[in-house]
Amino acid sequence: MAGHSKWANIKRQKERVDAKKGKTFAQLSRAIIVAAKHGIPDPAGNFQLRTAIEKAKAAGIPNDNIERAIAKGAGTYENDDTVYEEIRYEGYGVGGVAILIEAFTDNRNRTAADLRSAFNKNGGNLGETGCVSWMFEQKGVVRIEGNIDENALLEASMEGEADSYELYEEDDDQAAEVFTEMTNLDTLSQTLNDKNFNVTEVELRWIPNNLIYIENDEQAKSIIKLIEALESLDDVQNVTTNFEMADELMLLTVES
């Protein structure tokens, strides 16, 4: 889990100074639309919707926009017949790095063409469904921040039936990610909240079963460039890979 978590944390730091706020708003709004469409349009009884709303609020999306997205998903918003669907795409980057892409789109052909172009321009290949998904397992992840007592975290994790956790230091602040089975995510999140941990993010995440270690500078630059190209597409919600590289190489690549 460490490799993917490292990249996720670096992305999180980049997003704090990312100028593409409009794209972030669009992504989060689409996540709300799809969550409301797949379940009841009430966050109290729809965990996926509640999580999407929490992320949207954390990003500063106005309540009016959130309510409008819920209405679109529920089919009660007037003058809007746009239908979004959730699709997973799969492919490879340089060095055989496996890549999973989760997208929300109203046009499959457009999304596939955009993804194929991004792969081709950055040394990768868009593959068939199932070509890499077997290399990953979907887990629930709860992120906490603030002063963290590891003994208290261990006790809470066991009570919430977590599988494992990882501690981090970010900008002189403590953080941790706690992993669990998909079906236990709501329970774990509530347990950590009840134990007075500062829960800042709750999500489902694809975790690689095995990692590919990248040591070559050019390969590292190529895979990061491909990931950023994929993430820049409006229809793309999440990109997950199975690479690992040294901290120094990853930071150098991200900053270049």
UniProtKB/Swiss-Prot annotation:
Belongs to the TACO1 family. PANTHER family: TRANSCRIPTIONAL REGULATORY PROTEIN YEBC-RELATED, TRANSLATIONAL ACTIVATOR OF CYTOCHROME C OXIDASE 1. The keyword DNA-binding applies. It is found in: Cytoplasm. Pfam families: TACO1_YebC_N, Transcrip_reg. This is Probable transcriptional regulatory protein cce_0894. SUPFAM superfamilies: YebC-like (SSF75625). Gene3D superfamilies: 1.10.10.200, 3.30.70.980. Keywords: Cytoplasm, DNA-binding, Transcription, Transcription regulation. GO terms for biological process: regulation of DNA-templated transcription. GO terms for molecular function: DNA binding. GO terms for cellular component: cytosol.
